[in-house]
A protein has these predicted regions:
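Conserved active-site segments centered on acidic
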Residues: 1-72, 140-143
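Short, charged/polar low-complexity linear motifs in solvent-exposed/disordered segments
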Residues: 31, 77-78
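Helix N-cap/beta->alpha junction signal
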Residues: 70, 81-82
Length: 143
């Protein structure tokens, strides 16, 4: 099973979700993309440092924009916000598009830490980790 995490710029939330999912859940493979990626942008320094500290994982790559091929390959497309979910559905359609909180049985959006301090990044990281732990307990992820 392939899972695709989507956020705005593919510099904070979706790369964190990708690494958390891949490092903690080994029955599927995750990737991440952004809806509005600035050419040459990379994962934020704060997100990178947290992932290095928590998982020993150095994410050093350019942000990638969501493309048709990504949509075709993924069984689940998981956004961080309702607005992102609507945008993905507008562009590509989408019976397989959910927000992370929706899949976890919660409502609302995962806060965007972009431009904030490390404390906010840590809160976002912790929230994403908690939500991913929750969704991977469901039968649909236990195949």
């Amino acid at each position: 099973m392939k899972v695709l995490f989507v956020c705005t710029g593919n510099t904070c939330r979706s790369p964190m979700a990708e690494v958390i999912f891949n490092e903690t859940y080994h029955k599927a493979e995750a990737a991440s993309r952004g809806l509005f990626v600035q050419r040459g942008s990379t994962i934020s320094r704060e997100a990178r440092e947290i992932l290095q500290r928590e998982y020993g994982y150095d994410v050093d790559r350019e942000a990638e924009e969501l493309m048709d091929l990504d949509m075709a390959d993924a069984e689940y497309i998981i956004t961080m916000t309702e607005a992102q979910k609507r945008e993905v559905k507008r562009r590509y359609g989408g019976e397989r598009v959910y927000t992370l909180k929706e899949l976890a049985g919660e409502s609302g959006d995962v806060m965007d830490p972009y431009g904030m301090n490390e404390e906010i990044y840590l809160k976002t990281f912790s929230e994403i980790r908690k939500l991913i732990h929750k969704i991977t307990q469901f039968d649909k992820f236990r195949r």
